[in-house]
Each structure stands twice: as structure tokens, then as C-alpha cells.
């Protein structure tokens, strides 16, 4: 889902000549492990008003900034749960969330499973 959105954004920003969102999406992907990623901080880095950034971000991605960032984090966490032997708190930290309890709640909100349930389901599918 996120990759498709990135593709759409590339087409949109190239067509309009507006590289701001494309630049921000690249920054988010490259800095996902930082817990300081906020709309306000990203707006400051790019010298734009947070309200303007919020509006244009949603226009381009069809998602608000918070949901987009959470989706990126959850997708990366899912990959880490599938491929690694990291503990939940290590995965949380690697996607920029310092509180493992909050990470578990966020993960469940977006996947309807806890990280442990997701990992168990992946291993169950691999056994078949």
C-alpha cells in the first residue's frame, strides 16, 4: 500500500513540478528510526508552515501525515517481525517508537493483531 502511494506521489509531484512532498517522503523513509519525526519538525526542516504542509501532504498522499508515518512504521515493523529475531522493544525502537506498549497498541490498531500474534501467524503460515 505504501509503495503504491509513493509511486503515485512520484507521478503527481513530477507532473506538477512540486518536489516538496517527494523530498519529505524520502526523508521519512531514510529517517524512520528517529522518534522526532513530527509534522512540525518536518515543516521546520523544509521551511514551510505546518498547516500548509499538512494540507498539501494530504492532497498528494490521500493520507494525513500522522497516518502515513504510522503506516510506514508498521510496514517496516512487519518486515522486521517476518525476517528477524528482534524483540518487540527492539523493533519498536528501530521504527522510531520508544515505548513498546504504545508500539503494540499502534501495531494492533493498524493490523488487528499484536506484534506477537502477527509473528506467530507468519510462522504458522511458513510451516504450511
Where are these regions (language model features)?
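Short acidic/polar alpha-helix capping motifs at helix-coil junctions
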Residues: 2-7, 18, 51-54
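Basic/polar phosphate-binding segments, predominantly the helix-turn-helix DNA-binding elements
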Residues: 40-69, 94-114
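Generic hydrophobic, amphipathic alpha-helix propensity
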Residues: 20-24, 28, 69-70, 74
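C-terminal alpha-helix/helix-terminus motif
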Residues: 9, 111, 115, 119-126
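Basic, amphipathic alpha-helical hairpins
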Residues: 3-13, 25-37, 57-61, 78-86, ...
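Terminal helix-turn-helix DNA-binding modules in bacterial transcription factors
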Residues: 59-98, 120-128
